[in-house]
Amino acid sequence: LLMWNTSLDVFKQFTLAGVGTGDYDDVLTAKNESYGNSGVAKHRYNSHNQFLNTMVQLGLLGLVVLIMLFLNGFKMAYQQRNIIGILTLSCFFLNFLFESFIETQAGIILFCLLPLALFHLKPKAYL
């Protein structure tokens, strides 16, 4: 929760467009050092919340895009009666609350390709 509070404080300073993806670690580390969180600053921890990371990096605009990806995905899955798609997106959404999932290359690939593959399958209607 310490990192969540720090991330929210940084977001308040850079609300619209964020600090940028390249400056994220430096800005968060500097903010932690200014708060006296030397252990957190030393290890350069992120917030372990993808929504907060996106807010700090890309601002409100980036957060809106990320949320729209989920909303559009849920809408498509519901319209196609794709329960596997709904469950997959739900798992991603819950994971994003407690982990910075798309901060790594493996996370990006999984987040992009798995839903894409699931929405092109033609499952039986379960809903």
What are these regions (language model features)?
Residues 1-5, 9, 17-58:
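Long extracytoplasmic/lumenal interhelical loops at the membrane interface
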Residues 57-90:
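Hydrophobic transmembrane alpha-helices and their immediate junctions
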Residues 21-25, 62-65, 110:
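Short, flexible micro-motifs
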Residues 85-97, 101-127:
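Transmembrane alpha-helices of multi-pass inner-membrane enzymes
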Residues 47, 55-59, 102-110:
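Membrane-interface micro-motifs in multi-pass membrane enzymes
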